[in-house]
Amino acid sequence: MSKDRRAPHVSSDHPVSGVAGRYATALFELADAEGALDAVAGDLERISAMLNESSDLVRLVRSPIFSAEDQTKAFGAVLEKAGISGLVKNFIGLVIRNRRLFGLSDMIGAYTTLLARKRGEMTADVVSAHPLQAAQVESLKAALKSATGRDVRINTKVDASLLGGLIVTVGSRMVDSSLRTKLNSLKIAMKEAS
């Protein structure tokens, strides 16, 4: 593959680079050539959701203790149960054979970024203390669209350590309105005052 074919052919908000970026770009270009961008995105979203829900699956992905054979068997069963086949199944197999499964979450994120660029969307990562309701996500999308002038795709994640509030990252900008940050700021201010 020539060097200029490796670079994504769409404009960027986030650089997609490194090992995860190369794998995601290869999958993206293959999916684009086969007209399967949305199908692959759906499969990757399901895998991402499974990773968010299962600490055992995360351990399988991140731990170097598991052999490629163990990862292939276990992940193969997970993919089959989730009804994921085709490009994504082959992609995961390649990632496992190359011992890069630890970077799967980054690869999924990079693919999502590439797809959003192609669609002219921005991606916002939103971390909240509690799961957001659908109405809250839609309200946040509308507010971000108003602020950026572009359609915004929202990736949500729950982190109970925030206590309350949100951390929103769009491009290189981050807004941290979490209760944890406010309490830490108050604690620092109190230490400086004494």
UniProtKB/Swiss-Prot annotation:
The keyword Transit peptide does not apply. InterPro entries: ATP_synth_OSCP/delta_N_sf, ATPase_OSCP/dsu. The keyword Ion transport applies. It is found in: Cell inner membrane. Keywords: ATP synthesis, Cell inner membrane, Cell membrane, CF(1), Hydrogen ion transport, Ion transport, Membrane, Transport. Gene3D superfamilies: N-terminal domain of the delta subunit of the F1F0-ATP synthase. It is a peripheral membrane protein. It comes from the Bacteria. GO terms for molecular function: proton-transporting ATP synthase activity, rotational mechanism. GO terms for cellular component: plasma membrane; proton-transporting ATP synthase complex. Belongs to the ATPase delta chain family. F-type ATPases have 2 components, F(1) - the catalytic core - and F(0) - the membrane proton channel. F(1) has five subunits: alpha(3), beta(3), gamma(1), delta(1), epsilon(1). F(0) has three main subunits: a(1), b(2) and c(10-14). The alpha and beta chains form an alternating ring which encloses part of the gamma chain. F(1) is attached to F(0) by a central stalk formed by the gamma and epsilon chains, while a peripheral stalk is formed by the delta and b chains. F(1)F(0) ATP synthase produces ATP from ADP in the presence of a proton or sodium gradient. F-type ATPases consist of two structural domains, F(1) containing the extramembraneous catalytic core and F(0) containing the membrane proton channel, linked together by a central stalk and a peripheral stalk. During catalysis, ATP synthesis in the catalytic domain of F(1) is coupled via a rotary mechanism of the central stalk subunits to proton translocation. This is ATP synthase subunit delta. It comes from Parvibaculum lavamentivorans (strain DS-1 / DSM 13023 / NCIMB 13966).
